[in-house]
Amino acid sequence: MQTDCDVLIAGNGLAALTLALSLPESFRIVILCKNRLDDTASRHAQGGIAAAWSGEDDIEKHVADTLEAGAGLCDEAAVRAILSQGKPAIEWLLAQGVAFDRNHNGLHLTREGGHTCRRIAHVADYTGEAVMQSLIAQIRRRPNIRVCERQMALDIQTESGAACGLTVLDCRTQETYRIRARHTVLAGGGLGQIYAATTTPPECTGDAIAMAIRAGCAVGNLEFIQFHPTGLARPSENGRTFLISEAVRGEGGILTNQAGERFMPHYDRRAELAPRDIVARAIAAEIAKQTQDFVSLDISHQPAAFVRRHFPSIHRHCLSQCGLDITRQAIPVRPVQHYTCGGIQTDPCGRTSLPQLYALGETACTGLHGANRLASNSLLECVVTARLCAQAIADGQAFQAEPFQRPSESLSAEAGIFSDDLQNTFSRPVLQTFNQRHLGILRNDTGLRRAIAQLQLWKQNQAEPHTASEYENRNLLECSLAVAQAAYRRRQNIGAHFNSDC
């Protein structure tokens, strides 16, 4: 097959850039960026990268914490395969020029919810930005890597039952074209923009996951949408809610309700350090009992210099955007969509059920996260699986997953009861508000059946897309329906999925 490149990567986050830098320099590599190279969800990551690095920690402890957070639905073999590469991943990032915070013992490690010890390597509270800056600098030095900005991947091209490239939209001209490749990699992030309140940037419209569904790839665990407990309870900027890092609680931050009472000890023995799903539901429950739509996160009991040193970007943002000095005042917070725990099913090397197609990062479902992601495991997963993927591609290894049985999209008799109550008019804000209500942190059978019926109607009535925005809307609908169907099929409250009727 005549190709335009050896490896075609749709996405420009941490997993995508790690893969490009880990492949042999003899490979012709193309990176498709929907926006700019430096505009990606990875850049907004605050907390850090979890790895068993210190003398008091070991891989078994990290595995145990990950399995507990995943609520029994992790793939333990995948967990061990990925976490065992934590230390080499940190060493690789150091070699790329990432300047992690240090102290007299070496790397300064912080602790976050669900972790039983300090194991989070970080750069203050802007780890993602620091890591991406270092990797972008390395990318620009590689003549074999071609970066194409403002190019949106639309659909997977196949030949003889294997992926052979992508159909692409030039977002500047709205023209479509094809790129043929020996290996195709989807690393376009999650589907956070199906919600009205999310920490993800506007580009996270589920493009890669939607493409995979249309191509018949196996997907899984899409019902497990992680809501971060502490999004800043202020109007969002450019469709993205500002995140108050898990590490604020890891360094002693206390959650209080409208009455000024600390409430987390009533919900879990780990209090503020419980896994995200537990803390998020606890906050939602407290908000439901009070008049204000937020709770307070207070770190002001720590020395002001400590707060400014550990959380400079949070301190700066709250002060400049909200007039809030977190060294003296509590931060108003509420749960916000943050991470897609499921995605395209892969092995730890990123191989999907479609030959020559790989998926990495938040786009993928490796089995590491199970029903709920442990804080700071996602950046680790990006680096480790991308490096393993590079090795698999270079070695020409093959992989075949189990066939994917796509759920029927015909309206059920139960869903039909909403036929007189459905909206014909579609817009992205209407979709996002609808999903926030019915596919949010607290779900029920009636809401999920209504969601499936409404989303199917919108999807059936959708016109053929021609512009970037229209293609994004197609993907948002595809992903929304997949989440709703997966959530309705899950008859067990576990991890990030909670249905009050189960």
Curated annotation (Swiss-Prot):
Annotated active site: R276
Pathway where this protein functions: Cofactor biosynthesis; NAD(+) biosynthesis; iminoaspartate from L-aspartate (oxidase route): step 1/1
Q: Where is this site: Important in orienting the L-aspartate substrate?
A: E112
Report the coiled-coil segments: none
Protein's organism: Neisseria meningitidis serogroup B (strain ATCC BAA-335 / MC58)
> Which residues does the record give as FAD binding sites?
12-15, 34, 41-48, 207, 362, 378-379
Which NCBIfam families is this protein grouped with?
nadB
GO terms for biological process, alphabetical: 'de novo' NAD biosynthetic process from L-aspartate
Q: What is this protein called?
A: L-aspartate oxidase
Enumerate the catalysed reactions: L-aspartate + O2 = iminosuccinate + H2O2
UniProt xrefs under InterPro entries: FAD-dep_OxRdtase_2_FAD-bd (IPR003953), FAD/NAD-bd_sf (IPR036188), Fum_R/Succ_DH_flav-like_C_sf (IPR037099), NadB (IPR005288), Succ_DH/fumarate_Rdtase_cat_sf (IPR027477)
The task this protein performs is described as: Catalyzes the oxidation of L-aspartate to iminoaspartate, the first step in the de novo biosynthesis of NAD(+).
Give the required cofactors. FAD
Picking any one GO molecular function of the record gives: nucleotide binding
Q: What is its EC number?
A: 1.4.3.16
